[in-house]
Regions:
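Hydrophobic transmembrane helix segments
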Residues: 29-62
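Cytosolic juxtamembrane helix and N-cap/initiation of the first transmembrane helix
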Residues: 2-32
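Interfacial helix-start motif at the membrane-water boundary
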Residues: 57-74
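Structural signal for membrane-spanning alpha-helices in multi-pass inner-membrane proteins
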Residues: 79-82, 105-108, 131-135
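Central hydrophobic cores of alpha-helical transmembrane segments
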Residues: 93-101
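Juxtamembrane helix-break-helix junctions at the cytosolic face
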Residues: 72-92
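Membrane-water interface at the C-terminal end of transmembrane alpha helices
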Residues: 126-145
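Membrane-helix boundary connector in multi-pass membrane proteins
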Residues: 90, 102-120
Length: 145
């Protein structure tokens, strides 16, 4: 049997920019954030509660829905902010917003916390910690174009 070995060049690290890494981390955070809320609808009794105008201990009002949308909008906006702001401001904003969302993520576990919610919270916390780490260690010299 004659097998030819094809010589392939070694894989090359492309050096992804920090701001693109941050945008990717915020995107992952958003997917988890949204899916936890979506899967919440499959929990027994939750749709009935929503139809009666309650979510957890809160009445479903315009104010509640505005606050819920605002809490989702901030991480969604961070995807764009991470690639649009200048480095110095970008670094600060990412560290501050991620730090604020750490306790917020934990507070979302108040009351009834199912295993899928605990798993998502752990994954969200890991993503938020990576956001803080990458922003904190932002390179002084640009490594990408």
């Amino acid at each position: 049997m004659n097998t030819q070995q094809i010589s392939r060049p070694a894989l090359q690290d492309t050096g992804v920019c920090v701001n693109l890494k941050l945008a990717a981390l915020w995107t992952g955070f958003m997917f988890l954030y949204i899916y936890v809320d979506y899967f919440h609808l499959y929990m027994p009794g939750k749709i009935e509660d929503i139809l009666q105008g309650r979510v957890f201990v809160f009445a479903v009002t315009q104010g509640f829905l505005l606050a819920a949308l605002a809490s989702v909008s901030i991480p969604a906006l961070m995807i764009f902010v991470s690639v649009a702001l200048p480095a110095q401001l970008n670094r600060r904003v990412n560290m501050i917003v991620a730090a604020v969302y750490i306790p917020y993520t934990l507070l979302n576990l108040a009351g009834e916390a199912w295993m899928h919610m605990l798993f998502a919270a752990a994954a969200e916390l890991i993503l938020l910690l990576f956001i803080i780490r990458y922003a904190w260690k932002w390179p002084r010299v640009a490594k990408c174009k």
